Amino acid sequence: MLLYLVNFQSMWANYVLELLKDAFAFKIKAKELDIPLAAYNPFRKQFSAQLLLDYVVERYKDGLVFAIIDEDIYDSNYNFVFGLAYPFRGAIVSTYRLKNFERIKKEVLHEMGHVFGLGHCNNYCVMRFSNSVFEVDEKPDKYCENCYREILNNGFYVNPKYVIFKENYN
């Protein structure tokens, strides 16, 4: 896996690198990448998540990619997004609105779930859709058993410590 740090000088970078290694046992190469100016929308004062992710996946064709950025990002259907993913290809997460380790962890795990082929989940699960930081705070930092099984069935690995097993439900 290639981790892109998009114009990113921050404590979050090492945290995300270690999280990806621990959660998914990836061998990771980290590179810094400049933000493409074409991805900036001056009317919205935000970057297009889709254009950024397209830019990142075009530069690395040999495996999965993950990008982290500390800029506000949006997708065409939303005022903002925390991240965006392409199944079986790559993802981007913005720390701009998340601002703390727990939220960033949840959104990294969430977007990687999409990379592994998952959709949104209605269970008590990190794959639950979040439209606000409050909703991010309310969801767990783990996959439910159903999502875990689907990830494994799609040929990927998740460290079981990032899974809520039924016997541990409250």
From Swiss-Prot:
The active site is at E111 (proton acceptor). Zn(2+) 2 binds at C121, C125, C144, C147. Binds 2 Zn(2+) ions per subunit. One is catalytic, whereas the other seems to have a structural role. It is an enzyme of class 3 (hydrolase). Its EC number is 3.4.-.-. GO terms for molecular function: metallopeptidase activity; zinc ion binding. Its cofactor is Zn(2+). One of its GO terms (biological process) is proteolysis. Zn(2+) 1 binds at H110, H114, H120. It comes from the Archaea. Probable zinc metalloprotease whose natural substrate is unknown. Belongs to the peptidase M54 family. This is Archaemetzincin.
